[in-house]
């Protein structure tokens, strides 16, 4: 396979980009860490990693293991979902949120049922959606007392706002108003964040790495970020969220995954600073209480080898626990490289924190597994 035809699946899009043209796949080349790695190399490495589970039975088959360090330790349940795989399959489990009724909402790119809604015990309550082949980002927002969802679809190159039962309220097409996009295929949104005033921030994490801002009606306001060599620039802007933990200085928190970092911006897009997370290919930041949670898709030291874990930071952006990862170590106030320590996860893609502080982990390209649940250890 020629280098120019190498697909971006080596990082995140292995399955759902099948069928796209070589020209479209070129959008993903900037993210490939090693452009000599092609499909059979990835499969070989994945097979080797999977074999590692077979020769480590104490890890692979330990019942209800406890993961993490310090006061953020959790007991793992990898059989949480009670869904019938024949009736309600999943492909990539991309993101999860909890609604005000306590239900856990899962987004998958399986078009038999894009959205699966569970109770906290893992019972499947209902499903909907067959029109989101590239379902990737899922955000919930309380809009004047009514909860709504925002879905980012990689394949459709759109952001879709819906009711909790799937009725479409608004569709945002590619942001030609920016002057940065010639066609929809250049725009591959991965995440949204909604400000208190209803402004919508869209992360073009698999496209050109801009953060595009709209008002609550979907009218274009502006953009920032994008690729470049300055600190304000982004590389794989996979996620974005609103961080209100400092009431005097609320901000946007944006993933720059290939740089192993989060970056902070004002709501007008002015760069504030960078939170380095060496070794961690972080997905979207998730804020709950004083803490920041993030799935780590893979470790920099073991790319494309099912080397993910989950990281937790305190309100000062200090890593305090890694679930399935090495214990965080700071030398002279500098965080040292983190990586997977025990293979309980393959490619974690999102963390949902419920109202009882339980965690739900959605995984990409991990054998079509349903989400895992982790309960706090007191």
Where are these regions (language model features)?
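Surface-exposed loop and turn segments in beta-propeller and other repeat-based domains
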Residues: 78-87, 170-183, 221-232, 320-343
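Short loop/turn segments immediately following the C-termini of beta-strands
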Residues: 109-110, 154, 205-206, 245, ...
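Blade/loop signatures of beta-propeller domains
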Residues: 61-78
């Amino acid at each position: 396979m020629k280098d120019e035809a190498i697909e971006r699946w080596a990082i995140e899009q292995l399955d759902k980009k099948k069928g796209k043209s070589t020209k479209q796949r070129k959008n993903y080349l900037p993210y490939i860490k090693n452009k000599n790695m092609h499909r059979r190399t990835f499969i070989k490495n994945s097979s080797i990693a999977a074999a590692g589970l077979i020769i480590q039975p104490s890890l692979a088959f330990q019942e209800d293991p406890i993961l993490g360090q310090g006061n953020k330790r959790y007991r793992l349940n990898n059989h949480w979902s009670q869904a019938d795989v024949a009736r309600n399959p999943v492909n990539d489990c991309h993101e999860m949120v909890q609604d005000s009724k306590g239900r856990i909402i899962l987004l998958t790119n399986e078009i038999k049922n894009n959205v699966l809604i569970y109770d906290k015990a893992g019972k499947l309550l209902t499903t909907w959606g067959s029109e989101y082949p590239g379902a990737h980002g899922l955000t919930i927002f309380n809009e004047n007392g009514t909860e709504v969802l925002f879905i980012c679809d990689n394949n459709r190159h759109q952001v879709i706002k819906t009711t909790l039962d799937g009725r479409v309220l608004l569709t945002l097409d590619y942001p030609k108003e920016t002057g940065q996009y010639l066609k929809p295929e250049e725009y591959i949104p991965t995440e949204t964040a909604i400000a208190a005033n209803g402004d919508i921030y869209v992360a073009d994490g698999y496209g050109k790495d801009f953060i595009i801002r709209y008002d609550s009606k979907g009218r274009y306001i502006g953009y920032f970020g994008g690729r470049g060599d300055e600190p304000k620039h982004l590389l794989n802007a996979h996620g974005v969220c609103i961080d209100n933990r400092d009431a005097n200085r609320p901000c946007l928190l944006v993933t720059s995954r290939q740089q192993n970092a989060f970056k902070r911006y004002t709501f007008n897009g002015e760069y504030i600073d960078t939170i380095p997370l060496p070794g961690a290919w972080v997905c979207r930041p998730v804020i709950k209480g004083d803490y920041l949670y993030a799935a780590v898709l893979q470790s920099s030291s073991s790319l494309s080898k099912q080397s993910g874990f989950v990281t937790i930071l305190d309100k000062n952006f200090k890593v305090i626990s890694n679930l399935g990862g090495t214990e965080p170590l700071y030398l002279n106030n500098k965080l040292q490289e983190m990586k997977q320590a025990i293979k309980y996860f393959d490619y974690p893609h999102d963390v949902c924190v419920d109202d009882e502080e339980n965690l739900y982990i959605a995984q990409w390209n991990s054998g079509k597994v349903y989400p895992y649940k982790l309960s706090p250890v007191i």
